[in-house]
Amino acid sequence: MATDWQPECLVAQNQPSLDPVGAHSDRALQNTTGNVQSYSDQLAHAGVTARDDQFHQYSFKYPHGPHPQPLSAPGLHQQHVAARLHQRKLRRLHSVGPNSQSRRAQSSYLKSQKYMEYRRRPRRDTGKDGEPVWSDELEDAFQQALEANPPMGRRKWSERGKSYGRNELIAEYIFKLTGKRRTRKQVSSHLQVLDSFLKGDPDWERLVREPALERSSSVHGSAPAPKWRTAVEHPSGSSHYGSHTHPSYHDHMRSMQPYAGDLPPPHYTLGSNMQETAASTIHGFSFDMWVSAPQQANRIDKALHAYTRLQGDLHHPVAPPMPLEHVNGWRSSFPQLASMVDDVNNPLDCDIILLEVNLELMTDFPPTGSRLGIQLDLDYGHPSAGDVLGVSQMDNWTCSTHIYQDSQKLLETYHDLPKTQSTKVKPLFESSWWAKLFTQLTQEKRIAEDSGNPQAARDADDHARQFFRSLSAVQEIRATSPSSCRLSNQYQGHHGDESKRMAVLAWKFRQTRPGEVGTTTWRRLIPAPDRTTTNSPRPASAVDRVPLSLDSILLNKPSHQGIYQAPHPHDLIHHPSQSQSQWPMYQSPHDNVSNLYNPSGHLDFMSSISKAEDGLNDKIAVTSVLDSFSASLAPESISSTSLHGSSGAPVMLNVHDLPLTHPGMGYTMGHETSHYVPSQHHSVNMHDSNSVLHGFFGSHTQPLDDLSHGHGSWGTHSTSIPGDVGAGSYHIPYQAEHHGPVSRESQQPHQFDGLLPSEDLMDKIVGRMSNGSGMHGAGPDAGYDNATVDAV
């Protein structure tokens, strides 16, 4: 029994979790510490059928770690100096090409059975530093060095007056990546060992042998430049590690292609505080589960049996990030994660890691006194900058674990983690529960095999495989920043609301097939962004519509807001209804003939023809001026039922509101705010003037002149404007209307005399015009109105 493994986390051996579990074996895993188990002969026998009903009872609470002492100012200074030295030491790591990692992750030989069997062998040879010559860290650096230094045969790479062979470049690369030296001979020996069982693999041949065509064409040429040295001489804008921080969020949003008429995609970030978001980024991950023999070091490289071990790089996942919605049945597999995603008050602002664990079970019980070890490490330190964001200063680390079977909760535990002094956090993964589970599964398998019935053995194996397929887990790691700790000191024992979610781990399990090695892969999951920050997806049957240009928007804005001309009676027809938005109905049938004359009484065809504006109710309100859409789509006007004046000025036209929404836009206009609604009707055409007119006046044809005589309702007069304009805000005095007769005195000859008809003919044309209301002020006695609106 190992009593020296994490002595501060020892748990009593007579706890309820160690009830009898089997009737066939005299050995079972016994919990001794947080993540280490030991085999013991002190467990009694019991039935196997009680296994499924016992798992939900096991919940362990570990004691609090020692209270952290506040760091002094010199201590903080030393940390900054250490981080600076660490950054200087690993500065050249940025020279790694961005494509080397992706190519290495796709190498087939890393997933081959022979390579995995070689890596799971115990490492017996140690270097001068007392560590295995090719540990997992060095093996990962070695694989990166193979990608960064292409094969060069017997040629050399010259730099600073010295020649380097490929093995020397690989050894130098490993030293700069890990800080551990391996000689040229050690690199050569390791290559020979790997080549003995990887020879013939296309990916391996590409890394160790130079193509024949390239070798024959460059016999007298120089060796190919190492990729990482070329990158140093010609630095690029992004590096391998520099572009690693949250690559999924930017790439995912960049892949969204907007279509015509759509809003631009927003800048998507996780969380409101950039520094806190970067602090919760996981830069390294490690997970192993193994059994150590008695009197043997409790390490994965000395393991008696490895249930699973991390596959690939410790600092980079093997698979690219994947949207959370692409995980089949993630809501039923991870109910706790689903509740976090649906919580709008506490959005996910940390990394979500998906771990797919393949477990290789033991065929028999291990020797008495063996121990189960589980190593789970999360590294928040940047590979080159270290702990510059102060993750090691965070306190009150907690870990909650939820284990499910077919969406039914089997186990729920909460643990307080000891304060970390580095950037690595070691969450607990319920090793006692796993020890009991492995013992019971092995017990069932032995009972089935000893029965002599092959079908019973197959049923036991199928039962175990089905159990692992239905098994899932969710872990949430939280911590409190130093600033939150200082604020929470005012309230004794109250810091739960101040904690920050640091990571969410989603676990899926399966049992390996015969002959396979247990491996674990990890990848980041991208939660669906909030609906308020992204555009609605484009429907499959959508039709692209040309967006309005800026010129059309500006042309619809009124040019003079201070001058108001009194409208004509035919333009101001009042409808006895409530206040609604005003829409321009039609253009004037003809312009005022009197405007053809300049003030001197001469005909002037070079000047523009001025026309009185439609009315006060057609003015654009302030809210629509602030909106980015054209006023012609959904104009807002002063909601006034009538315009009242003491001088007898005519009133304005009020019509019912038309719910016209542009089919290509998702906005509707109102007086209070603009609400986003999905477009539902695609049959409305804004340019269909007939449908708009029929909505007001019916489908029958009627002269517009008759409309002002028989279908208009006139209201009383007042000097106030109700609606959008508050009482007392504006006062509109009107000047008395007067008509200025048009003088037709003798005119001076000008350059258009040859083009115009004679004066007698013009007199006949003008004299025959009547002064009736049907002329709308265009008769010979008509004048022009001159009224202004002054804002008080």
UniProtKB/Swiss-Prot annotation:
One of its GO terms (molecular function) is RNA polymerase II cis-regulatory region sequence-specific DNA binding. Signal peptide: none annotated. It comes from Penicillium roqueforti (strain FM164). The keyword Transcription regulation applies. BrlA, abaA and wetA are pivotal regulators of conidiophore development and conidium maturation. They act individually and together to regulate their own expression and that of numerous other sporulation-specific genes. Binds to the sequence 5'-CATTCY-3', where Y is a pyrimidine, making both major- and minor-groove contacts. Induction: Expression is positively regulated by pcz1. Residues 114-131 have a biased composition (Basic and acidic residues). Residues 97-111, 236-246 have a biased composition (Polar residues). Its main location: nucleus. GO terms for cellular component: nucleus; transcription regulator complex. It comes from the Eukaryota. Transmembrane segments: none annotated. One of its GO terms (biological process) is sporulation resulting in formation of a cellular spore. The gene is abaA. Residues 61-134, 213-272, 708-732, 767-792 are annotated as: Disordered. The keyword Nucleus applies. Belongs to the TEC1 family. This is Conidiophore development regulator abaA.
